[in-house]
Amino acid sequence: MEVILRKTNLNDLYVSASGRLDLDNAVEYGTKIKDFIEDSDDVITNVTLDFAEITFISSFGLKVILELYKQLKEQQGTIKLKNVSEQAMSSFKMVGFDKFLLFE
């Protein structure tokens, strides 16, 4: 899985990836994001996850998103998901993530 991370503003991170966010890829995806946030000279408080090319999300992927949400919430930050497919959105809704995550 290729994960592209780029700062769009001082405190904003934009993440795009392609493929399946499952057991094989979720840990790598989450680790790359967390490492980028921790290694940044600036405090990253807003993260946008672009799901345009994510074809599937498993419970492992959902766990990574939840951990990222909790990390950002501690810093009064936000996480926003955009271009989420209907299949992925049904997974988010099934576990109640649509109640606290921002979707665009």
Where are these regions (language model features)?
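Short beta-strand/loop segment at the start of cytosolic alpha/beta domains
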Residues: M1-S16
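Amphipathic alpha-helical interaction surfaces in cytosolic regulatory modules
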Residues: L21-F100
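Short acidic-hydrophobic, aromatic-tinged amphipathic segments that line or gate anion-handling sites
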Residues: L102-E104
